[in-house]
């Protein structure tokens, strides 16, 4: 049976947008811009971030350029879901933003899909690769599911070419392969690097 046109038009369409790339590529800046655009269009917008990310602000998503957007810090997908569903009971939510999805547990991917299926626009950011240049958790799974994917590049902080890798620096030297996967810090711990300037010490 083919649904009639009126039924199709009445159903609010949801989708997933992924903004990805290396560090310092402007992912969060683009994320904030998109959410602000939706808010300007009178849509109800809510943003979340992982508690672990406290580089510039606790209750705001912050870009490296200093742009801020109010957000709700959460420890897990379960906490995000609890807070978001409570907001949805209060009023309609049109757009949900989730920053740094690589820091969430793996349940976040299924919940993002559920929200889109319910007619909500979900905009997420995440690093495509970790400091070892291996696919990052959650981003690798959301990549084939998202309707829109933007992969941003940065400027190599060593040679000035375009960069698509995240270089971890410890005590002024490239990090060892075996150093911890998650280490949230600022400019002192990471650099954007191109293919030629990226280094990893395999100890």
UniProtKB/Swiss-Prot annotation:
PROSITE patterns: TK_CELLULAR_TYPE
Entry similarity comment: Belongs to the thymidine kinase family.
Enzyme Commission no: 2.7.1.21
GO molecular function, one term: thymidine kinase activity
Keyword Cell membrane included in the entry's annotation: no
Record SUPFAM superfamilies: Glucocorticoid receptor-like (DNA-binding domain) (SSF57716), P-loop containing nucleoside triphosphate hydrolases (SSF52540)
Subunit structure: Homotetramer.
UniProt organism field: Mesoplasma florum (strain ATCC 33453 / NBRC 100688 / NCTC 11704 / L1)
Entry's Gene Ontology cellular component terms: cytosol
The protein's name in its UniProt record: Thymidine kinase
Chain residues that bind Zn(2+): 156, 159, 194, 197
GO biological process: DNA biosynthetic process; thymidine metabolic process
UniProt keywords, alphabetically: ATP-binding, Cytoplasm, DNA synthesis, Kinase, Metal-binding, Nucleotide-binding, Transferase, Zinc
Localisation per UniProt entry: Cytoplasm
Top-level taxonomy: Bacteria, Bacillati, Mycoplasmatota, Mollicutes, Entomoplasmatales
Residues that bind ATP: 21-28, 99-102
Reaction catalysed by this enzyme: thymidine + ATP = dTMP + ADP + H(+)
Active site feature: 100 (proton acceptor)
Domain of life of the organism encoding this protein: Bacteria
InterPro entries per record: P-loop_NTPase, Thymidine_kinase, Thymidine_kinase_CS
């Amino acid at each position: 049976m083919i649904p009639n046109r009126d039924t199709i038009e009445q159903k609010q369409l949801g989708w997933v947008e992924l903004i990805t790339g290396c560090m310092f590529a402007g992912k969060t800046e683009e994320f904030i811009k998109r959410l602000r655009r939706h808010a300007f269009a009178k849509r109800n917008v809510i943003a979340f971030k992982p508690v672990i990310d406290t580089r510039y602000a606790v209750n705001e998503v912050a870009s490296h350029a200093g742009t801020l957007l109010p957000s709700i810090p959460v420890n897990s997908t379960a906490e995000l879901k609890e807070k978001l569903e409570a907001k949805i009971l209060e009023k309609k939510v049109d757009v949900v933003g989730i920053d740094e999805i690589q820091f969430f547990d793996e349940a976040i991917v299924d919940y993002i899909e559920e929200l889109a299926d319910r007619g909500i626009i979900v905009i997420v950011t995440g690093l495509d690769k970790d400091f070892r240049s291996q696919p990052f958790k959650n981003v690798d799974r959301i990549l084939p599911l998202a309707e829109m994917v933007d992969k941003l590049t940065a400027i190599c902080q060593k040679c000035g070419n375009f960069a698509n890798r995240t270089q971890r620096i410890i005590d002024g030297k490239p990090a060892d392969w075996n150093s911890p996967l998650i280490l949230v810090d600022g400019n002192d711990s990471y650099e954007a690097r191109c293919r030629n300037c990226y280094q990893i010490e395999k100890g």
